[in-house]
């Protein structure tokens, strides 16, 4: 299991402990990827997981670029369309730094 997969598993477990329900992992489209798809009450939650072992090059949150946010939004829109979902959604980020988990709800 790669570090990215380990971080996604850790994030998924953490979010499930917080009351979210797991739907799908690593949804890939030619134009973008969604790390985790979760549900929280009536919302579908698209989660980007960022891992950094140390923040010497900036923390996990700083690793998320505007271009990457655009690709995630496009992938989420496509996901909702292909699954015929007309539901509220949000974009969360789970940042894992030095074994600490930071969950940013509605991050972008």
From Swiss-Prot:
Gene3D superfamilies: 3.40.1350.10
Domain of life: Bacteria
CDD domains membership: PoNe_Nuclease
Pfam families reported in the protein's UniProt record: UPF0102
GO terms of molecular function: nucleic acid binding
Alphabetical list of NCBIfam families matching this protein: PRK12497.1-3, YraN family protein
Family classification: Belongs to the UPF0102 family.
PANTHER family listed in its UniProt record: UPF0102 PROTEIN YRAN
Protein name per the record: UPF0102 protein Shewmr7_0260
Organism expressing this protein natively: Shewanella sp. (strain MR-7)
Lineage: Bacteria, Pseudomonadati, Pseudomonadota, Gammaproteobacteria, Alteromonadales
């Amino acid at each position: 299991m790669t570090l990215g997969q380990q971080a996604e598993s850790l994030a998924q477990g953490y979010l499930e402990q917080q009351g979210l329900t797991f739907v799908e992992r690593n949804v890939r489209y030619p134009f973008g990827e969604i790390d985790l798809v979760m549900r929280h009450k009536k919302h579908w939650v698209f989660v980007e997981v960022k891992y950094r072992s140390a923040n010497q090059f900036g923390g996990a949150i700083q690793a998320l670029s505007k271009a990457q946010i655009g690709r995630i939004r496009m992938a989420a829109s496509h996901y909702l369309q292909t699954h015929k979902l007309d539901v509220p959604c949000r974009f969360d980020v789970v940042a894992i730094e030095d074994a600490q988990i930071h969950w940013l709800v509605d991050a972008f």
